[in-house]
């Protein structure tokens, strides 16, 4: 009954005109009308509720929800004299969104007379034409922008970034705008924080006034410290813009962020009105994306390495028939996998809770009002569910905890010494020790919790502030819809090895794939929510254009899709251009994956030349960049005649070495000086003829 009334209140509030809600504090007759309307709404919703079975959830549960479009208060855009700040975020894993919300929450405490609104860039404008109209009205903006992949924007920032960087010349049209940009990236990658840097520069070029230098958050170290340092630069600038001379709000009292916490409602599992949320093939939405994935069964799983190998590489096929999911050759698939059961059991012991604990998760208070610290809450995962389900599918348990998680653990540690130690590790004074003991040692969240056994956060805190949401893992699709229209193929190397603490780290998704049960062996097969992320890693529109593909190890994945595509075109009578594949592995008797298929592509004419580097066969290690040097003349002939170059694989090592080799080939074969060589290679990238799918 309580849940039904809560649903009635929520529904009534959403349909009543704003005047009625406001009338409760004004005209008694209007207040009576509002009350009557709410009661009628409640009766209607209660009738529907009980007729439908007492609130039992539908058979097909909703997938992980997308954050709703930004709700702006009725007076947020009114000209009431208050100064306004818009805080944008472009996020892939939720970190940028978390920083944006934390910044806004602290800013509201510091500047009570100002209005702050946090906006998902994807929700800012329904159509591209609206971007300019809306931006012209902004006066102060803060942007939190993550760089993803090979210098690309995140999914939710891609449309804005494309419009802002590729649109018509706008000249000086943002002269009334003041802005600050914080980037999130990893210094190990070539295009470190490219998106933030580009947006920061373009905003200035188009008339905006930069408040502070662009923040360069580095996830390879402690990105939270980078955010804190940048934030401390921003406050004095905002003080000048938002604080009156007589305004001392927040100036003397240090701000302490509230620890985010979901509202948890424990449910008697015997209540048949509630069922554990389950998945169906369709996701109930017309959209399939990171927030609306679809369930896909594992159809095929097989080991690609030979028995002599001490490593593992898995070929997996997802069955997408009946899901509405489509893909193109070269796209990526995002996979929401499960934690290993051993990992989950350890978490259950540390939380001291039964795996059958049944509960629902809510981001608001019982009366529907925002929770304390709720401004930084992510939308809750689907519930009700058991603790076992929540830990399996939604909790990131193996990454190193952020400092905010240590603060939350400290708040719920019964041992004072443990609480003090946790707070120290999260403090500026403990920066070096946190860097060594947590980050460099690759201590997982569960390892840290085991080291502080008195820290027992309630479930609402654990899922909101301690364990981040388990993120999808991305894989280059290794098939073509021309050959496999109802399947998505994945080629995945098993992540397995010791950490500095001696723990054997097993990759969450690769381990799940290694142990997956395919439908060809059992009706009780493994499955995962998946979605397709579009990529610009595509074959030339003209199939006669020559191509060079460079992909050692699992970097072969998208090129297997390319070659399937070319084979299908060949079989349909289409003329193909020259194609060369540089592949690398350790030993032909261990890890030469898809060897038979590659030979068949050559025999059928889909592949012109296959060049393989074996790094562990001869006296000297040989890699793909060495083979490129041997084929320098051939590579230059293809490139100089309009050919395309594709690279897939490790960004930190292989892709850098290949880039250097290409630079040398262009310089020597083209007889160019260093400056002209750099310009030539950059023009290949700008023209879309030098494409990289790297991680």
From Swiss-Prot:
Source taxon at top rank: Eukaryota
InterPro entries, alphabetized: CysJ-like_FAD-binding, FAD-bd_FR_type, Flavdoxin-like, Flavodoxin/NO_synth, Flavoprot_Pyr_Nucl_cyt_Rdtase, Flavoprotein-like_sf, FNR_nucleotide-bd, NADPH_Cyt_P450_Rdtase_alpha
An annotated Gene Ontology molecular function: FMN binding
Cofactor or coenzyme needed: FAD; FMN
Domain annotation Flavodoxin-like: ranges: 85-235
The entry's keywords: Endoplasmic reticulum, FAD, Flavoprotein, FMN, Membrane, NADP, Oxidoreductase, Transmembrane, Transmembrane helix
Record field: transmembrane: 30-50
GO cellular component: cytosol; endoplasmic reticulum membrane
SUPFAM superfamilies the record matches: Ferredoxin reductase-like, C-terminal NADP-linked domain, Flavoproteins, Riboflavin synthase domain-like
Topological domain spans for side Lumenal: 1-29
Binding residues for FMN: 91-96, 146-149, 184-193, 219
Ligand binding (FAD): 473-476, 491-493, 507-510, 695
Expression triggers: Induced by drought stress, acifluorfen and cadmium. Induced by jasmonate (JA).
Residue numbers on the Cytoplasmic membrane side: 51-695
Membrane topology recorded in Swiss-Prot or TrEMBL: Single-pass membrane protein
Family annotation (PROSITE patterns): FAD_FR (PS51384), FLAVODOXIN_LIKE (PS50902)
Binding annotation for NADP(+): 311, 554, 615-616, 621-625, 657
Cofactor note: Binds 1 FAD per monomer.
Family recorded in the similarity comment: Belongs to the NADPH--cytochrome P450 reductase family. In the C-terminal section; belongs to the flavoprotein pyridine nucleotide cytochrome reductase family.
Protein known as: NADPH--cytochrome P450 reductase 1
Organism encoding this protein: Oryza sativa subsp. japonica (Rice)
Gene it is expressed from: CPR1
């Amino acid at each position: 009954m309580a849940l039904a009334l809560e649903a009635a209140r929520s529904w009534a509030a959403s349909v009543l005109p704003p005047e009625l809600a406001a009338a409760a504090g004004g005209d008694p007759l209007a207040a009576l009308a509002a009350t009557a309307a709410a009661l009628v709404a409640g009766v209607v919703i209660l009738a529907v509720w009980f007729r439908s079975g007492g609130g039992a959830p539908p058979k097909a549960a909703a997938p992980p929800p997308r954050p709703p479009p930004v709700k702006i208060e009725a007076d947020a855009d009114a000209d009431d004299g208050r100064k306004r700040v818009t805080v944008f975020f472009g996020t892939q894993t939720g970190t940028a969104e978390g920083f944006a919300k934390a910044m806004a929450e602290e800013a509201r405490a510091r500047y009570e007379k100002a209005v702050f609104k946090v906006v998902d860039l994807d929700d800012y404008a329904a159509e591209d034409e609206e971007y300019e109209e809306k931006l012209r009205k902004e006066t102060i903006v803060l942007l939190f922008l993550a760089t993803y992949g090979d210098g690309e924007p995140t999914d939710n920032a891609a449309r804005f970034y494309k419009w802002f960087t590729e649109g018509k010349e706008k000249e000086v049209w943002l002269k009334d705008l003041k802005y600050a940009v914080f980037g999130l990236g990893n210094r190990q990658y070539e295009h470190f924080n490219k998106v933030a840097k580009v947006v920061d520069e373009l905003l200035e070029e188009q008339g905006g006034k930069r408040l502070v230098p662009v923040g360069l958050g580095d996830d390879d170290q402690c990105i939270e410290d980078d955010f804190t340092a940048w934030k401390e630069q921003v406050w004095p600038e905002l003080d000048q813009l938002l604080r009156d001379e007589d305004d001392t709000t927040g100036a003397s009292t240090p701000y302490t962020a509230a620890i985010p916490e979901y509202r948890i409602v424990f449910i008697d599992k015997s209540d048949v009105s509630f069922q554990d949320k389950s998945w169906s093939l369709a996701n109930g939405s017309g959209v399939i994306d990171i927030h609306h994935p679809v369930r896909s069964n594992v159809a095929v799983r097989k080991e690609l390495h030979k028995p002599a190998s001490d490593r593992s590489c898995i070929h997996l096929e997802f069955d997408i028939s009946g899901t509405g999911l489509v893909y193109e050759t070269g796209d990526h698939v995002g996979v929401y996998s499960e934690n290993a059961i051993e990992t989950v059991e350890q978490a259950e012991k540390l939380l001291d809770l039964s795996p059958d604990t049944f509960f629902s998760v809510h981001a608001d208070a019982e009366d529907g009002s925002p929770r304390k610290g709720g401004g930084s809450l992510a939308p809750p995962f689907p519930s009700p569910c058991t603790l076992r389900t929540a830990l399996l599918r939604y909790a990131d348990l193996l990454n190193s905890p952020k400092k905010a998680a240590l603060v939350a653990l400290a708040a719920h540690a019964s041992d004072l010494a443990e609480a003090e130690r946790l707070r120290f590790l999260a403090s500026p004074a403990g920066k070096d020790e946190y860097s060594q003991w947590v980050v460099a040692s690759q201590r997982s969240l569960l390892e840290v919790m085991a080291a502080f056994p008195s820290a027992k956060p309630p479930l609402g805190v654990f899922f909101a502030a301690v364990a981040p949401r388990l993120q999808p893992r991305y894989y280059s699709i290794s098939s073509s819809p021309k050959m496999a229209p109802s399947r998505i193929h994945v080629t995945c190397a098993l992540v397995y090895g010791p950490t500095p603490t001696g723990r054997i780290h097993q990759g969450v998704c690769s381990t799940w794939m290694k142990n997956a049960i395919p439908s060809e062996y059992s009706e009780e097969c493994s499955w995962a929510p998946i979605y397709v992320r579009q990529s610009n890693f595509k074959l030339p529109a003209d199939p006669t254009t020559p191509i060079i593909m460079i992909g050692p190890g699992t970097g072969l994945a998208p090129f297997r899709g390319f070659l399937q595509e070319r084979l299908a075109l060949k079989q349909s009578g289409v003329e193909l251009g020259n194609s060369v594949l540089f592949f690398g592995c350790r030993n032909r008797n261990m890890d030469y994956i898809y060897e038979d298929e590659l030979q068949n592509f050559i025999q059928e004419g889909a592949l012109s030349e296959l060049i393989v580097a074996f790094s562990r066969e001869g006296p000297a290690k040989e890699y793909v960049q060495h083979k490129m040097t041997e084929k320098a003349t051939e590579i230059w002939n293809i490139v100089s005649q309009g050919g395309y170059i594709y690279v897939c694989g490790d960004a930190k090592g292989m892709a850098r070495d290949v880039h250097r080799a290409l630079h040398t080939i262009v310089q020597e074969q083209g007889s160019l000086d260093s400056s002209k060589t750099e310009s030539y290679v950059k023009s290949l990238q700008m023209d879309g003829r030098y494409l990289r799918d790297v991680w």
